[in-house]
């Protein structure tokens, strides 16, 4: 039995990043068939697949980012055109549509181009999400019709994904543009490492973020200054309470039992727990503005429960 188990493990390890040929093996999952062409670009017949362990060999230093969002597997195809640069299609299968949205949201900055459930195209890179999939499509160089080729490849890839999926409900629990929400600033996060990359709080995970929690970070323009709103949902009331108390102890020790304090930059930080939610506002010059935004968030939480 041990010999059989060892054999199975060895086979699994050596096939983690396999290269297959032919359309009959072009299936990423039971419902996904990646395209064989896009515009004048045609698939070279090779398909590379990576699981969570093999992902580190494909992208040095970036694998942890996808793993934080529940990465399951990656399929990569290259498309070639005579006289033009190759176009690469990377299709990431995540644990859920919420995770795919999170990957997309993390670096969202360009205008939507109408592909998938959310997309952007800039600097020769097309990014979009649809269902539980996130796609990154780019050319390995410049040339005529490259941009149109990337967009055609994107539309074909999106059409191969039959199912859509919901955005994180938590993203709808924050105030909108009427309260100064900055366009394209909403980030859906599943780890404190990712949170720190967008807005540094502490080296330690003082808010106890994990795959069991959800967090939304967004920027608001208040009195011509940008403030950061962080909304976190925990699995239950106890975990929310533990995280809130730890945050107040470590980050706002000067609050002394209150829900707010000025930090070293002389700006206000406010934090409250509401049931399984923790709401924190960073960097407000005016206490009244911070209170208004925090209260608006609490009202959204009550309305959507």
What is the role of each PLM region?
Residues 5-8, 12-305:
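Soluble, non-membrane globular domain cores that form compact, hydrophobic packing
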């Amino acid at each position: 039995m041990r010999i059989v188990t060892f054999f199975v493990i060895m086979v699994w390890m050596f096939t983690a990043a396999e290269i297959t040929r032919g359309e009959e093996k072009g299936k990423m999952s039971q419902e996904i068939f990646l395209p064989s062409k896009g515009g004048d670009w045609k698939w070279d017949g090779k398909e590379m697949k990576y699981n969570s362990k093999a992902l580190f060999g494909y992208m040095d230093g970036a694998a942890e980012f996808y793993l934080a969002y529940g990465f399951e597997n990656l399929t990569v195809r290259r498309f070639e055109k005579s006289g033009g640069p190759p176009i690469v299609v990377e299709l990431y299968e995540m644990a859920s549509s919420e995770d795919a949205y999170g990957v997309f949201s993390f670096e969202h900055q360009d205008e939507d181009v109408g592909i998938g459930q959310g997309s952007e195209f800039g600097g020769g890179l097309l990014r979009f999400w649809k269902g539980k999939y996130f796609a990154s499509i780019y050319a390995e160089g410049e040339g005529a019709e490259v941009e149109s080729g990337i967009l055609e490849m994107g539309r074909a890839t999106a059409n191969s994904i039959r199912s859509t999926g919901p955005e994180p409900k938590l993203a709808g629990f924050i105030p909108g543009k009427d309260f100064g929400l900055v366009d394209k600033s909403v980030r859906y996060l599943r780890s404190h490492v990712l949170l720190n990359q967008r807005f540094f709080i502490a080296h330690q995970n003082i808010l106890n973020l994990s795959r069991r929690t959800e967090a939304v970070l967004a920027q608001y323009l208040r009195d011509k200054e940008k403030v950061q709103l962080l909304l976190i949902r925990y699995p239950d009331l106890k975990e929310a309470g533990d995280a809130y108390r730890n945050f107040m102890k470590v980050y706002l020790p000067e609050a002394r039992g209150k829900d707010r304090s000025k930090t070293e930059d002389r700006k206000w930080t406010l934090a409250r727990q509401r049931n399984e939610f923790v709401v924190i506002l960073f960097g407000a010059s005016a206490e009244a503005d911070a209170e208004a935004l925090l209260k608006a968030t609490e009202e959204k939480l009550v309305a959507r429960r």
